[in-house]
């Protein structure tokens, strides 16, 4: 199975610019154009933070760009919720927030790790029980789980304060199942790692790129967009290629936060103390 994995599009329902700088719709168009010639795509997976303003119009813009792109290739478009997404508007345009997609002899399961009014992630007992029930029966070539907040620790200081709450609860459900891969976003930079032997793939952001080279008390983002091309063979480990969608403005500063700015956001949108 070949997957084009896109995340953190942060679209608007109007012509607003992200941080007053980034045209996120144009960035998504660049990403799709960069993937234009890839053969054999089976799925286009978007792993959350699809909208910035939570408007129905923003989700329609996303659907109207991605669905035809996927359809032209005989691929399936699959969408997951992120912390910026609005549950009702998402569901109205894109369908259920948690879902099982059968892809031939594979299966893709989307989860909703969003917490209303917050930026950290969480999966409640009911959702984990549902996932465990779905995974109780395996499929021939295994399952891919899509969840916005990665079940692995962040690299940058702000995102370490906005991680998935209790990732071990999710990993415990995945243990011993047929899950072969987890696709995530949220961190706005590419990351590939293993948790309990399961590959975790975090896609680059579309709206901007987190700078992982900053000092400990600095969070910085720059203009830059890309996606992950994920090949999941019938057996063995996935192969992940990271692809940039270049623009003339790549590398321009989007925002920079010092320690006070980081902790202000964490107090407002992080886990309750």
Give the ranges of each region predicted by the language model:
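His/acidic metal-ligating clusters that form di-metal
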Residues: 31-43, 120-201, 228, 238, ...
């Amino acid at each position: 199975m070949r997957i084009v994995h896109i995340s953190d599009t942060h679209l608007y329902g109007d012509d607003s610019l992200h941080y007053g700088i980034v045209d996120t719709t144009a960035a998504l168009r660049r990403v799709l154009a960069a993937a234009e010639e890839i053969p054999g795509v089976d799925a286009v997976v978007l792993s959350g933070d699809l909208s910035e303003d939570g408007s129905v119009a923003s989700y329609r813009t996303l659907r109207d760009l991605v669905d035809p792109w996927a359809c032209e290739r005989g691929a399936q478009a699959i969408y997951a919720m992120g912390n910026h997404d609005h549950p009702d508007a998402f569901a109205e345009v894109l369908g259920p927030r948690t879902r099982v997609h059968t892809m031939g002899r594979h299966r893709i399961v989307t989860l909703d790790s969003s917490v209303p009014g917050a930026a950290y992630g969480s999966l409640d007992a009911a959702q984990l029980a549902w996932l465990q029930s779905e995974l109780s029966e395996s499929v021939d070539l295994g399952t891919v789980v899509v969840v916005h907040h990665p079940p692995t620790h962040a690299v940058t200081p702000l995102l370490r304060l906005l991680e998935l709450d209790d990732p071990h609860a999710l990993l415990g459900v995945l243990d011993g199942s047929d899950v072969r891969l987890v696709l995530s976003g949220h961190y706005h930079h590419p990351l590939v790692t293993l948790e309990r032997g399961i590959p975790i793939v975090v896609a680059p952001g579309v709206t901007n790129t987190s700078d992982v080279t900053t000092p400990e008390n600095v969070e910085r983002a720059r203009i830059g967009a890309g996606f992950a091309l994920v090949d999941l063979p019938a057996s063995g480990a996935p192969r992940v290629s990271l692809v940039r969608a270049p623009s003339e403005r790549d590398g321009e500063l989007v925002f920079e936060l010092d320690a006070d700015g980081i902790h202000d956001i964490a107090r407002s949108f992080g886990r309750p103390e």
